[in-house]
Each structure stands twice: as structure tokens, then as C-alpha cells.
């Protein structure tokens, strides 16, 4: 008999019919003998409706009061699911974040979980009840309602699994697992049976938005086995876990991630003096613009070029900040490009394999795709290319790294 | 500087515009120097929407879980009002029933308030904040969310006023006070400046649905001065208070209430033996049918007739129960009538005035209105008449008891 935490997102509980389907699924697990804690999001669209109500009062609504409103979304779904389970003869009880009690810090709208009281949940599980918990919300030490920020229900699921030392945290979504790359781009993409936390982090942050990145970090930190599954289709999904078996048979790379949401900015002819990177990125950061890749090459003629990428939505803003900076520090010019794409190969296997990057560059060269920027980490290599080559690049790499064929061990 | 509890109902907070108007009103009071606790209902229609969601899962939803859902309605409005106040530069904070903490028993969907912790509210008031509290909800000693039943926000307001020893509890509604009778029936109806708790109870239970009856009882018990006011019009409203000055100038009756929602049932030729009333009403009560008036006259020929009224919606059900009973106890026949109306005169003044009832009967006789049933209490006389005479009867009585003219002392 296992203890399983199951998390269903907004689409999975988006209507009464869907909630009834989730109840059927939960009942099946319960009848198989598992102890179950179910974490729910608000019905899809509901959180936006509530935020919109608040914004009709004030574009910048008071953060404490916003959490009071937004937290009602999950409060409705947990009670609906508990009712649906009770109707099926499955004893169940719902808890808000406050009732559990999921203690957070007091950063309204983006709170972090500090501690979970497992007392009530354990006693309900012992009494044979399914416990349905509101995701995305908690309470600070003064009893103020807090929320974890958008998508935070995944984090609630993982945190509960960690606190309860659950055997598995199952995240139900609208995909049946994590794939070697986006199947819409590469039809031969394969569902991965397993992936490590580190790989998943690189895949998620690079645009394979299956799981919320914070929840993966959290799961890795507390070593909670995470499984991504489809809400309404049968199948084993993908297990995200620690890297247990670094065997010969492990593929060199696990997947190919990509992202077309970025834009690139370059400031050229920057005097090559200490502190210049800060002078450039300081004002960007002060303007609340997030930077992804940063590349600076060695200087020549005492000047250097400095390039970074930002979200495409923030390109104009970043450009105007950077133009000011260029004047101040005496740089030659600022240029930018929004028609770029980032492609990354990810895999813990590359740690022990030399030549992974060169194999990547080689297969792009074969397709005559020019590489504009390169950055690397221990388990990934990312390149920026012209956007129109994105699909071609992903397909070429998918084949070059032997991801097309059904993989060994699967 | 007074401490005032203000309660706004669902219509008063039914849209963002209305909530902004309430915020303007609250700000004015605050700027005048009063300490304010504001109690809110859910937006009109929202509670029904939430109940409907629950009923889509189960016609008889689990009571605990229903409270979890339904309580979100007020949780949204309190935060919206707090935001609107903060936007206006008025420091404000919202609290759910659980956050206050309003402790209730565990009768879900119809809980009763046991105790209110005034600690947080007092410290907020001291800090100059307007405190916005969710009406209609509380929490039991195990932390389960409870609701007080439909319309319970009035009760929350009165209970808070009692706990805080507030100077006044103001109930904002869609009428500008309590009238001598329904102005739609008698255009000369007058707004009462004052009315006693007892009179208000009789008026409310008889169909002048301005205030929730439980809140009036509660206010009377704890002697909380209640004031009924219009949410969006200026005016002093009607003060409901204890009967301080039983002066000569006090009118004999304060108002005329009426009700067309009832139906009458008579069981005839009942053997006149002890216990027969219970044999008749026992099965009615067991069928969860509420009975209003009950009349039994003295027996003749060892049989008696027994008449009572029920809500018109329950007439058919009551009729079938009563026909079974008639067979069992050997009664002659069962007859009924749904085309009836009840008219009542209410006033503490009648205690010290003889002949009030006969004056009532006289003025009805003058209009040739036949009286079918009569029942009396210390401060009211009710009669049942044929429904079509209702307006005529109310107007005749309004004139007979001198309620048409502006009254002395106003």
C-alpha cells in the first residue's frame, strides 16, 4: 500500500464533468488500496476571472487582499471533488491551505512554503479518507492567506509529498509524459520513461513547459519521485527521479528543448574595463527585465561586444535602456534581433562524453544553419540561431543524437 | 467617536460599481471619525451560482463541503471592498469568518455563532484600519468552515456589534427603512423613525422581509441598536431598539404586515379526545412541513374542527399527509384553500389599549370582508381572509389605525 500525492491542474478540473472524471480516477486508485492526497488547482479560467475582478477595482490591487480573492478558486474545486468522492462512497475531506496548515512566508502573491503540518492529513488517511488539498495557497504565521504565485499547485503537491514522505507525487497534465522534443516539430519524438531532476530542470526552463520549474527543484531537493501523467488517458507517463544508474546504455542526451520567445540585444564597441558587465546589466535588472543567455567574448582593440537575450515582450523596453547605457559608457552601437530561436540539447550523459557540443555544431553546419550565440552548462549546450531554421535544427539534432528510434530499455 | 458596524447585502455589493459606491460611503463615515467594522454578503447571485455548482455534483451535497464552497462568495467581496478602500487612502483589512475568528457550532449550512474573538479587530481599529468581515460564515472548534444559512450576514453584523459593544449596527438594504405597511399596497405608508425589537420581529415574521428575523432576535437579546438604511440614498432610516418611552403619544399600532404565501387546511369532524392535536400535527411535522397559524375551536357533538396554515408550496404535500391522518383518526373530511391571505396589525401600544382587535374586525366588516381565522399574541392580531380582499383590507386598516397621516413626533 503506497501513499501517493496526486495533483490535477486547472484543465483537469475545468468543468463538473471533468471533476467527476477525476473522482472516478481517484476512486480507482483508492480501491487498489493506495492512500491518497489529492491537490487541485482552480477551474481553468477562474483564477484569471478573479484577478480581473480585483483589477477592476485597482490595477495594482493590494497584494494581501488579492490573495484573499484568488485563493477562493481552489477552495471551490476541492469541495466539489470531495463531494464527488463522497457521492461515490469514497470517504473524503477537503482542506484549504490554511486548514492543513501550509505555513508560508508573508510574500503575498509569491509566497514560499516554510512548513506543512501533516497532523490532520495523517489522521484522515488513517481513518481511510481521501484528503483533498487546495494547491497554490497557504497561510502566514499571522493567519493571513497567501498564494504561491501562478502554477504553484505543482509546488504544493511536491511539498506535501515531501512532508508526508509519499512514495510518489503524480502530476496529471494534458500530455502523457515528457518527450525527447516537441512532437509537433518532430513526429518521431519519443516519450521518456525516466528523466533526472537536473535534465527536467533544463528542459523546463528551456521551454518544455510540462512542469513548473520550482516544483522540480523542490522535488529534487527532497528527492520526491515525480511522475508526469495524462489526466484522462491511461499510461505510465514519465518518472522524474534521481540519476540512479549511470550505465553504458544511458543515452548521451535525453532531449532537445527550444524556445522562440526570446530576443537578442548586442552592445558593440564597449570599452573593455572592469565593471562594464555590471554597468550594462545593472540598469536592465533595475528595469525588472529578466535576462536569459549572456555572452561576452574576449576583447580586441580594447573594446568588446556584449550580447544577451530577453523575453521578446521586453525587447523594446530593454533596447531603450541599453541605448541609454551605450551613451553613458561610450559604446559604439546597440543592435538587436527578435527573429531568433534558442535550441538546446540536454542530458546528464554528456558529462561523460566528450565531443557532444562538436557533434551538435557539426549537424547544424551540415544543414547550413549559422550559430549566433553559444552557451553551455554541465548538462546542456544551447545555441541561438535564426528563427526560421528552428524546426530544421531540432529535427537534425533529434536524428543526430539517435532520439528518433525507440530507445534501449524502453 | 462612535464604533459602528455596517452591514451591506448582496445587492449593495452586486457589482464592481456598487462596491466602489460602498467604499465611498464607508470613507465618508471614516472621515467623520467613526471606527468602522463592515460586514458583507456575497455578490447577489453568487451564492446561488455556487450552490448550483455543488448540486451539479450531488443534489444533496455533503454539508461540510458545501460550506467550503459557499463561503468563497463573501471572501471575494470583502477583499474587493478592502482593495477599494485602500485605493481611496483608507487603511483597511479583510477577514474571513475563520480569520476573525467567529466560532460556531458544527451544524453545517445553518450554524449558530458561539463566540467571537474581538482581539484582531480591536487592534486593527486601534491602528486606524477599517475592518471588513465576511458575513454569513464562521468556523467550528475543529477548524471546519461553517455557514449560518441564507441571509445570515445580518446575524454576523449584530453578533459583531454585540461582541464589540458597538454603538449601532447599521443594516444597509434596498429600502430606506421600515414602513407602516408595504408602500406598493398603501401609497400613504409612512417610514417609521423607531420600532421596537418585538414589533420588528412580528413585522418580519409576517412578511415585511426587511431584516432577517434571527438577527432581530439577536439584537434584542444583546440590546444592540439596529438601524435599517438604504445603501445608496441618504436618510436616517429606521432605528430598531428597546421600548424606552411608553408614552401617551405612542401610536397604538406600528404597522400592518401581510402575507400571501400561505394555504389553509382544515380537518373536520375530528373526535374530540385528548392528544388529537398531536395526532394531526405530528405527521405534518414529521414530513418537515412548517405550520404557521393553528386554530381549534371548542367542540360540539363530541367532534371538533382543526385548521392550520402552511406555506403554499407545501400545500399538496400537507394535504396528502392530512388525508391519511383523517382516515386513521376517523375524521369526517379534509378541506383546504390556497387562495387566502394573512393580515396582521402589530404594535406594542396595543398592550395598554383595549378594543384594538374589535376595531380591526369592525373596519374589515365595514368593507364586507369575511374573517376566516383569527389568532392573537400580545402585540399582534392576525386574521386570514380571502386573498382577493388583501389590498382592500390593508388599506382600510392603515386608515382605521391612523397610519396614513404623518405621525406625531416625526
Describe the residue ranges of each PLM region:
Chain A
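Active-site C-terminal subdomain of aminotransferase-like
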Residues: 224-236, 260
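Short hydrophobic alpha-helical runs that function as membrane-insertion/retention elements
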Residues: 168-172, 226-228, 292, 373
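Acidic-aromatic/histidine active-site loop/patch
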Residues: 219
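Nucleotide/pyrophosphate-binding catalytic subdomain
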Residues: 1-216, 297, 309, 384-386, ...
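Conserved beta-strand segments of alpha/beta enzyme cores
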Residues: 91-93, 225, 290, 370
Amino acid at each position: 500500500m503506497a501513499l501517493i500525492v496526486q495533483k490535477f491542474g486547472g484543465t483537469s478540473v475545468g468543468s463538473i464533468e471533468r471533476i467527476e472524471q477525476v473522482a472516478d480516477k481517484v476512486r480507482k486508485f483508492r480501491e487498489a488500496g493506495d492512500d491518497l492526497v489529492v491537490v487541485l488547482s482552480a477551474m481553468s479560467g477562474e483564477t484569471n476571472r478573479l484577478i480581473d475582478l480585483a483589477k477592476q477595482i485597482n490595477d495594482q490591487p493590494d497584494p494581501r487582499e488579492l490573495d484573499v480573492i484568488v485563493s477562493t478558486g481552489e477552495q471551490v474545486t476541492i469541495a466539489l471533488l470531495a463531494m464527488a468522492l463522497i457521492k461515490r462512497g469514497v470517504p473524503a475531506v477537503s482542506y484549504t491551505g490554511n486548514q492543513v496548515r501550509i505555513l508560508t512566508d508573508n510574500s503575498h502573491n509569491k509566497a514560499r512554503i516554510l512548513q506543512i503540518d501533516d497532523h490532520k492529513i495523517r489522521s484522515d488517511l488513517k481513518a481511510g479518507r481521501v484528503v483533498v488539498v487546495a494547491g497554490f495557497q497557504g497561510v502566514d504565521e499571522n493567519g493571513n492567506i497567501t498564494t504561491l504565485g501562478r502554477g504553484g499547485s505543482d509546488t504544493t503537491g511536491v511539498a506535501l509529498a515531501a512532508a508526508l514522505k509519499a512514495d510518489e507525487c503524480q502530476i496529471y497534465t494534458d500530455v502523457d509524459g515528457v518527450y525527447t522534443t516537441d512532437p509537433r516539430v518532430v513526429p518521431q519524438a519519443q516519450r521518456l520513461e525516466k528523466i533526472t531532476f537536473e535534465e527536467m530542470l533544463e528542459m523546463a526552463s528551456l521551454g518544455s513547459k510540462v512542469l513548473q520549474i520550482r516544483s522540480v527543484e523542490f522535488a529534487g531537493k527532497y528527492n520526491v519521485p515525480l511522475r508526469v501523467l495524462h489526466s484522462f488517458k491511461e499510461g505510465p507517463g514519465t518518472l522524474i527521479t534521481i540519476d540512479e544508474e549511470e550505465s553504458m546504455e544511458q543515452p548521451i542526451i535525453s532531449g532537445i528543448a527550444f524556445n522562440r520567445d526570446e530576443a537578442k540585444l548586442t552592445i558593440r564597441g564597449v570599452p573593455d574595463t572592469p565593471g562594464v558587465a555590471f554597468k550594462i546589466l545593472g540598469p536592465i535588472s533595475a528595469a525588472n527585465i529578466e535576462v536569459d543567455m549572456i555572452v561576452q567574448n574576449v576583447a580586441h582593440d580594447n573594446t568588446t561586444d556584449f550580447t544577451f537575450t530577453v523575453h521578446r515582450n521586453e525587447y523594446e523596453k530593454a533596447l531603450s535602456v541599453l541605448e541609454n547605457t551605450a551613451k553613458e559608457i561610450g559604446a559604439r552601437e546597440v543592435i538587436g534581433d527578435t527573429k531568433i530561436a534558442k535550441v538546446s540539447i540536454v542530458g546528464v550523459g554528456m558529462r561523460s562524453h566528450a565531443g557532444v557540443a562538436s557533434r551538435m555544431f557539426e549537424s547544424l553546419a551540415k544543414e547550413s544553419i549559422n550559430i549566433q550565440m553559444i552557451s553551455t552548462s554541465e548538462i546542456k549546450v544551447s545555441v541561438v540561431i535564426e528563427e526560421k531554421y528552428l524546426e530544421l535544427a531540432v529535427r537534425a539534432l533529434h536524428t543526430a543524437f539517435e532520439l528518433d528510434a525507440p530507445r534501449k530499455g524502453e
